[in-house]
From Swiss-Prot:
Recorded GO CC terms: cytoplasm
Binding sites annotated in the UniProt record for ATP: 50-57, 167, 196, 218
Organism: Ectopseudomonas mendocina (strain ymp)
PANTHER family attached to this UniProt entry: NH 3 /GLUTAMINE-DEPENDENT NAD + SYNTHETASE, NH(3)-DEPENDENT NAD(+) SYNTHETASE
Pathway: Cofactor biosynthesis; NAD(+) biosynthesis; NAD(+) from deamido-NAD(+) (ammonia route): step 1/1
Family to which the UniProt record says this protein belongs: Belongs to the NAD synthetase family.
Annotated gene: nadE
Enzyme Commission numbers on file: 6.3.1.5
Binding-site residues for deamido-NAD(+), renumbered to this chain: 147, 180, 187, 267-268
Catalytic activity: deamido-NAD(+) + NH4(+) + ATP = AMP + diphosphate + NAD(+) + H(+)
Residues noted as binding Mg(2+) in the record, renumbered to the chain: 56, 172
This protein's name: NH(3)-dependent NAD(+) synthetase
Function: Catalyzes the ATP-dependent amidation of deamido-NAD to form NAD. Uses ammonia as a nitrogen source.
């Protein structure tokens, strides 16, 4: 492990590889305890999370549901509950996966907010967008989608006196692969510190459908490239990112890409600058 790898892994509080199944189970329990303690300490009773159909939201959603079920059993307070939210932009091309995820998560309550009208309405009011190339405009509007989804989730949470869960984990955090004040905004991030294959391992252990566990990750924000794989955007694979974060050898090219991207996206992981 290079000094830079160690520095980045420490900054992201990366969880070491699971030594065995017992370590995996212990990590699941630790994260459920974190969710339960966060709720109890907040004095609130409701969790809210957008479900996309990917492995990250599937895993975080199931952990959230299990946590509120345990809280109800432990406290006798039936007000603890989890709201899973679908946030499509018009019709999602992999809606079947989102529905499979919802079925697996088995949330106490489900809600749907189609963000298309809000995204279009805002985009039409911002004249600066019309000056951009098609590709640049598509990228900017992709970030608008992520931020509108954040607004919707926090609106639901506010209406129910709840907290918003985020799905960020170490393999995305190191690449800054989230929208600032969009999907990066949340009250608690129960997958933090995990690398991608650890998220998959937790999902599999919890019983998630295999096609969701192994699904190709995509942010799916761009109209010109629907379903664009994360790894294509990264320029490296999740296997390489995971190996880097766990201090293992990666190619010189992968190492340089990860370090360069980490440095370039530092602003996403920090609080706003002040004088």
């Amino acid at each position: 492990m290079s000094n830079r790898q160690a520095e980045i892994a420490a900054a992201l509080d990366v969880v070491p590889p699971f030594a065995d199944d017992a370590a995996l189970v212990a990590e699941i329990e630790r994260r459920k305890t974190f969710i339960k303690n966060t709720l109890k300490q907040s004095g609130l009773k409701v969790l809210v999370l957008g479900i996309s159909g990917g492995v990250d939201s599937t895993t975080a959603g199931r952990l959230a549901q299990l946590s509120v079920e345990e809280l109800r059993a432990e406290t006798g307070d039936t007000d603890y509950r989890f709201i899973a939210v679908r946030l499509p932009h018009n019709t999602q091309h992999d809606e079947h996966d989102a529905q499979d995820s919802l079925k697996f998560v088995n949330a106490d309550e489900e809600a749907t907010v189609n963000i298309a009208a809000s995204v279009i309405g805002l985009s039409e009011q911002v004249s600066h967008l019309q000056q951009l190339s098609d590709a640049r405009r598509d990228f900017v509007i992709g970030n608008v989608k992520a931020r509108i989804r954040m607004v919707a989730q926090f609106t639901i949470a506010n209406a129910n006196n709840g907290l918003v869960i985020g799905t960020d984990h170490a393999a995305e955090a190191v690449m800054g692969f989230f929208t600032k004040f969009g999907d990066g905004a949340c009250d608690l991030a129960p997958l933090s510190g995990l690398v991608k294959h650890q998220v998959r391992a937790i999902a599999a252990h919890l019983g998630a459908p295999q096609h969701l566990v192994q699904k190709t990750p995509t942010a799916d924000l761009e109209e010109l490239r629907p379903g664009k794989p994360d790894e294509e955007a990264h320029g490296v694979t999740y296997a390489e990112i995971d190996a880097f974060l766990h201090g293992q050898n990666v190619s010189d090219e992968a190492y340089a890409t990860i370090v360069r991207t980490y440095d370039a996206t530092r602003h996403k992981r920090e609080l706003p600058l002040v004088p």
